[in-house]
Amino acid sequence: MQVKANDTTTARGREAEDRAARHLERGGLRVVERNFRIRGGEIDLICRDGKGLVFVEVRQRSRSDFGGAGASITAGKRRRIVLAAQHYLLGKPDCDCRFDCVLIDGEQLEWIKHAFSADD
């Protein structure tokens, strides 16, 4: 059986999200949803931090030829994450939230709290 490149990419992404989720849970967050999708946007992990929500983008790069994992989070990507978060928050008035990123470059993992805001 031949493995398609897309299947491999999906598996790597899932592994990165699993690794990020474990790290976030060790840091005190509780993962409440994974891969929340709407038309035009997606959030990798949605976590609970006390009474607030944390929307987490997970980016992985095995090589830095085109910049590290953080370089791949463009303004357009941030807008799509914010759009998905706004949709998720419908019906949840007065819910505090923030946007974090987990960057995985090779074996190194970095958790950036408050990585961007809805106004960026």
UniProtKB/Swiss-Prot annotation:
Region entry Disordered, spans: 1-20
Which Gene3D superfamilies does the protein's record reference? 3.40.1350.10
Highest taxon of the lineage: Bacteria
An example of a GO molecular function for this protein is:
nucleic acid binding
Q: Which InterPro entries match?
A: Restrct_endonuc-II-like, tRNA_endonuc-like_dom_sf, UPF0102_YraN-like
Q: Which HAMAP family does the annotation name?
A: UPF0102
Q: Which PANTHER family match?
A: UPF0102 PROTEIN YRAN (PTHR34039:SF1)
Give the family, as the similarity comment puts it.
Belongs to the UPF0102 family.
Q: Which named protein is this?
A: UPF0102 protein Daro_0503
